[in-house]
């Protein structure tokens, strides 16, 4: 199968937005106009193509980032009538699913940032924007819902500038706003575009309406000044009053978008079919192809020596698995991005992280959840493979003869957990397998068991996250389960540095056990997890026993000394020890490591940590005092407040333990007129009174 379009004509994009900005509807319209869809799906009637899980259709929110592909020939600009392939990853807007956004952004080249013309920049827009900044993803802005009462394109653009610190440059302005939204003025061509009232997909080009001439000139000057600032040749022409051509404006706008210095801003109403075609033209015109993004870097599996791969079919194959999904018909699907080379169906790939070779049974390109078989996939493609058994999210797939490890994805730790138990014996057998499959798909979902109670615990990023997963157990895996009350995922760490000896000796006739280790424990900065340093000199602890010492320490870290919670952010250095020729074994050194760590942790000023959430509440002014008082009573710290879109907002840092059931309280406190978002911020030390209560509750089970 030959390549359908050249690599320079491929666009890998995501549509990123706050929940309710019209993201799924916009994606539906893209598929409709590019000929992939014959009937438009609406989110509010549960018919949207990209929202393919049952819960998504019911809740009207997108949970999993489905990937789809389509073709588009721009109707104007520097790429007019050239066939392009657009691969779209639809990303969720709900804060509990930020992991989906994170992994999508990792494999994208560009993004369309969607904003609501009424709400402007919402809290989740900020979260997603920060994630996109982290990966330096070039963006265009599309202000949607221009037909809504209260729509204000200029206020939305101002909010993008002020709240996101970006440089949005309108390349269109609206003709009418709200119910009288009729079309746009194209500032590059200085023409008016009026959409057909009924359909919106047809339009006519007109002269700029008389009452908008002054405004259009003002915004065209704004655009020309913005592009002149990033290009010296254009600046000279502009200052000397020479004409700047359309092609020149587009070329410099493209360069500035690719380097992140400008965000071209457009507007429309996806629901009313107005503006989507011009947004597609802008995707082609301003967002990068894999060629623009350039080489991807990684390292050799055996060492840290750097390797790069050019985006070319002639390079060795390298791809990144960014999502695992279970398909009811073909089983496990591994979504991956091809960075270089060609991969054929039926061939073998190396998982560079595990060292295992696996056969790719089938290759598919997805249109939402419909599949199209492919004989081969090429550099720049996003596709799904069937038949890969041991691949996890973030693994590198590559040519076995030319291995490379691409940068891994880092996912946040879960902050909330609940106990789950099967309703019947039949469910019991299926529960473990089903939970395992869900954990494979979602790196922020963890399954563990409480050794004392024997309960199965599931952990995730929020109440909605776990609710959706329990719902999937029932629908997809036909497993009925009861769930307990949500529990906070507390952690422990140390504040001091100490040295300690761990000794395990058993002499009871015959072969005994002997292991002695001297370790130093010290705190690491938050989020670093665990670090082990082997500083043994002269073989006082034989090399073969050193991994066992680390294993024993990690075992002990699962059960901290304050209240039995997992320990994090600790560095342990093994610097001395003793062994016995006959009695020493891996087991004796593992136990010595465990004893040593427990003893050291007790002396190293151990503390209990709790997850702190970043909470933002948007409320009518009359409830502001009540909302702030309530947040303070929840041990919250008010970080800021202000006005947005006619309402007040409050930002606060609040312990997760105090936020269960908050939505119900907020609803009754404000007659349902306020809403809030919440995301994990950091782990902080628990106040003494709370720590004592938790210790009492746990019976300080870790202190034995």
UniProtKB/Swiss-Prot annotation:
| Gene Ontology BP terms | ribosome disassembly
Any Pfam family the entry gives: GTP_EFTU_D2
Q: Where in the cell is it found?
A: Cytoplasm
Where is GTP annotated to bind?
17-24, 90-94, 144-147
Q: Name one GO cellular component term.
A: cytoplasm
Q: What is its main location?
A: cytoplasm
tr-type G domain residues are 8-291
Q: Does the keyword Electron transport apply?
A: no
- The entry's keywords: Cytoplasm, Elongation factor, GTP-binding, Nucleotide-binding, Protein biosynthesis
Keyword field contains Endoplasmic reticulum: no
Family statement: Belongs to the TRAFAC class translation factor GTPase superfamily. Classic translation factor GTPase family. EF-G/EF-2 subfamily.
Task: Tell me the function of this protein.
Answer: Catalyzes the GTP-dependent ribosomal translocation step during translation elongation. During this step, the ribosome changes from the pre-translocational (PRE) to the post-translocational (POST) state as the newly formed A-site-bound peptidyl-tRNA and P-site-bound deacylated tRNA move to the P and E sites, respectively. Catalyzes the coordinated movement of the two tRNA molecules, the mRNA and conformational changes in the ribosome.
Question: What is the protein named?
Answer: Elongation factor G
Q: Which organism is it from?
A: Chlorobium phaeobacteroides (strain BS1)
């Amino acid at each position: 199968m030959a390549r359908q379009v050249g690599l320079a004509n491929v666009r890998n994009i995501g549509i990123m937005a706050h929940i309710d900005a019209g993201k799924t509807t916009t994606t539906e319209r893209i598929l409709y106009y590019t000929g992939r869809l014959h009937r438009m799906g609406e989110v509010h009637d549960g018919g949207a193509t990209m929202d393919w899980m049952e819960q998504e259709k019911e809740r009207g929110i997108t949970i999993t980032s489905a990937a789809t592909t389509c073709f588009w020939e721009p109707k104007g600009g520097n790429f007019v009538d050239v066939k392009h392939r657009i691969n779209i990853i639809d990303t969720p807007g709900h804060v509990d699913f930020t992991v989906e956004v994170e992994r999508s952004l990792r494999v994208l080249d560009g993004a369309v940032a969607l904003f609501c013309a009424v709400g402007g920049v919402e809290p989740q827009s900020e979260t997603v924007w920060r994630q996109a900044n982290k990966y330096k993803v070039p963006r265009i802005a599309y202000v949607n819902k221009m037909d809504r009462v209260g729509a204000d394109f200029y206020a939305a653009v101002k909010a993008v500038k002020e709240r996101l610190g970006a440089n949005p440059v309108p390349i269109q302005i609206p003709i009418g706003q709200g119910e009288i939204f009729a079309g746009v003025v194209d500032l590059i061509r200085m023409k008016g575009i009026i959409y057909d009232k009924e359909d919106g997909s047809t339009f006519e080009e007109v002269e700029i309406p008389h009452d908008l001439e002054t405004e259009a000139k003002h915004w065209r000057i704004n655009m020309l000044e913005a592009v002149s600032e990033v290009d010296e040749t254009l600046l000279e022409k502009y200052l000397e009053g020479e004409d700047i051509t359309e092609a020149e404006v587009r070329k410099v706008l493209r360069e500035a978008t690719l380097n992140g210095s400008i965000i071209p801003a457009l507007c429309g109403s996806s629901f009313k079919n107005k503006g989507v075609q011009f947004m597609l033209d802008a995707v082609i015109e301003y967002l990068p192809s894999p060629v623009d993004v350039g080489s991807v870097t990684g390292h050799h599996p055996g060492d840290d020596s750097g390797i790069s791969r050019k985006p070319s079919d002639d390079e060795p194959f390298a791809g990144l698995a960014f999502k695992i999904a279970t398909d009811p018909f073909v089983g496990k699907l591994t979504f991956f991005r091809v960075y270089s080379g060609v991969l054929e169906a039926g061939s073998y790939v190396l998982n560079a992280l595990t060292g295992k070779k696996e056969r790719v049974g089938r290759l598919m390109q997805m249109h939402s959840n419909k599949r199209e078989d492919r004989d081969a996939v090429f550099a720049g493609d996003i596709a799904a493979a069937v038949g890969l058994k041991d691949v996890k999210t973030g693994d590198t797939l590559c040519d076995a003869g030319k291995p490379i490890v691409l940068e891994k994805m880092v996912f946040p730790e879960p902050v909330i957990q609940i106990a789950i138990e099967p309703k019947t014996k039949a469910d019991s057998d299926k529960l473990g397998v089903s939970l395992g499959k869900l954990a494979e798909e979602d790196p922020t979902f963890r399954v563990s068991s409480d050794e004392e109670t024997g309960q199965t615990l599931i952990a995730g990023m929020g109440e909605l996250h776990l609710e959706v997963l329990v719902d999937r157990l029932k629908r997809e895996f036909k497993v009925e389960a009861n769930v307990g009350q949500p529990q906070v995922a507390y952690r422990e760490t140390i504040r001091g540095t100490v040295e300690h000896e761990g000794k395990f000796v058993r002499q009871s006739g015959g072969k005994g056990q002997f292991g002695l280790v001297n370790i130093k424990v010290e705190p690491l900065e938050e989020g670093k997890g665990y670090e082990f340093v082997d500083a043994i000199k002269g073989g006082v602890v034989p090399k073969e026993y050193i991994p066992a010492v680390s294993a024993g320490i990690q075992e002990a870290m699962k059960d901290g000394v304050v209240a039995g919670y997992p320990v994090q952010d600790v560095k342990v250095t093994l610097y001395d020890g003793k062994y016995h020729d006959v009695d020493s074994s891996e087991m004796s050194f593992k136990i010595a490591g465990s004893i040593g760590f427990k003893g050291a942790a007790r002396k190293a000023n151990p503390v209990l940590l709790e997850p702190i959430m970043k909470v933002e509440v948007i409320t009518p002014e009359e409830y502001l005092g009540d909302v702030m008082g309530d947040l303070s009573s929840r041990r919250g710290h008010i970080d800021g407040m202000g006005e947005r879109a006619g309402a007040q907002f409050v930002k606060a840092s609040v312990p997760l333990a105090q936020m269960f059931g908050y939505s119900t309280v907020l609803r009754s406190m404000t007659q349902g007129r306020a809403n809030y978002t919440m995301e994990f911020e950091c782990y902080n030390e628990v106040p003494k009174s709370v720590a004592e209560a938790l210790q009492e509750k746990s019976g300080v089970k870790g202190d034995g």
